[in-house]
């Protein structure tokens, strides 16, 4: 079973990935992890990628594609894999199709965990931190027991990281939506896209994912 897992930041993709790996026993291939491994192991593509990263430049598609291809050539992917964070654009999607054709494989499903942007902004911008002891809270999921007072140290001074501020979160989501929309259309046309409602409880989301994968 060969999968691609898609979802905007905050959609709960990481949690679903762990559950899929546990039940279906396929490797979770996250681009961040394979980049680090390729650079550490000094693979040909890892060496190329490091040149760009060291200069603070974006790694070109052909190098990213090469790193994914190196990983998909490893033995543990022969019975299936789950890609997470790749492809990020249509050029990478075409490259993935070519890789799979070359190795006599095909993509079985693209699972898209869908959560409305306004819900994601709420999820991602709800985090706040006690300035005194550093304990992290969330306005919706993990608030302080007494409003305005830290459970751990009793402090009253909280702050929000710049990354977690609603405007920053919204901008980050906008960038991701622009990247994801053409990919969603691409995979819809190929007939392999399955969109899952990510606004349900984690268990219900996974139930829907599992149903799709079991019936492939």
From Swiss-Prot:
Metabolic or biological pathway, per its Swiss-Prot or TrEMBL entry: Purine metabolism; AMP biosynthesis via salvage pathway; AMP from ADP: step 1/1
GO terms for MF: adenylate kinase activity; ATP binding; zinc ion binding
Protein location: Cytoplasm
PROSITE patterns found in the cross-reference section: ADENYLATE_KINASE
NAD listed as a keyword: no
Enzyme class: transferase
CDD domains for this protein: ADK (cd01428)
EC numbers: 2.7.4.3
Binding annotation for Zn(2+): 130, 133, 150, 153
Pfam families: ADK, ADK_lid
Subunit structure: Monomer.
PANTHER family attached to this UniProt entry: NUCLEOTIDE KINASE
Entry similarity comment: Belongs to the adenylate kinase family.
Functional description taken from the UniProt entry: Catalyzes the reversible transfer of the terminal phosphate group between ATP and AMP. Plays an important role in cellular energy homeostasis and in adenine nucleotide metabolism.
Domain text: Consists of three domains, a large central CORE domain and two small peripheral domains, NMPbind and LID, which undergo movements during catalysis. The LID domain closes over the site of phosphoryl transfer upon ATP binding. Assembling and dissambling the active center during each catalytic cycle provides an effective means to prevent ATP hydrolysis. Some bacteria have evolved a zinc-coordinating structure that stabilizes the LID domain.
Protein name: Adenylate kinase
Organism: Limosilactobacillus fermentum (strain NBRC 3956 / LMG 18251) (Lactobacillus fermentum)
Taxonomic classification: Bacteria, Bacillati, Bacillota, Bacilli, Lactobacillales
């Amino acid at each position: 079973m060969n999968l691609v897992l898609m979802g905007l930041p905050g959609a709960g993709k990481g949690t679903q990935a762990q559950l899929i790996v546990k039940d279906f026993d396929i490797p979770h291939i996250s681009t961040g992890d394979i980049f680090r491994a390729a650079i550490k192991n000094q693979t040909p593509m890892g060496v190329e990628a490091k040149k760009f990263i060291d200069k603070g430049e974006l790694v070109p598609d052909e190098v990213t594609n090469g790193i994914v291809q190196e990983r998909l050539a490893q033995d543990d992917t022969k019975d299936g894999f789950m890609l997470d964070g790749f492809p990020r654009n249509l050029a990478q999607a075409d490259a993935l199709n070519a890789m799979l054709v070359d190795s006599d494989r095909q993509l079985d499903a693209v699972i898209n965990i869908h959560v409305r942007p306004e819900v994601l902004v709420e999820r991602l911008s709800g985090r706040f931190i006690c300035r005194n002891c550093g304990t992290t809270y969330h306005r919706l999921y993990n608030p302080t027991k007494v409003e305005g007072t830290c459970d751990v140290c009793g402090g009253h001074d909280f702050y929000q990281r710049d990354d977690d501020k609603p405007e920053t979160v919204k901008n980050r989501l906008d960038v991701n939506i622009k990247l994801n929309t053409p990919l969603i259309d691409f995979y819809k046309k190929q007939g392999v896209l399955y969109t899952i409602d990510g606004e349900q409880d984690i268990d219900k989301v996974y139930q829907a994912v599992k149903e799709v994968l079991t019936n492939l």
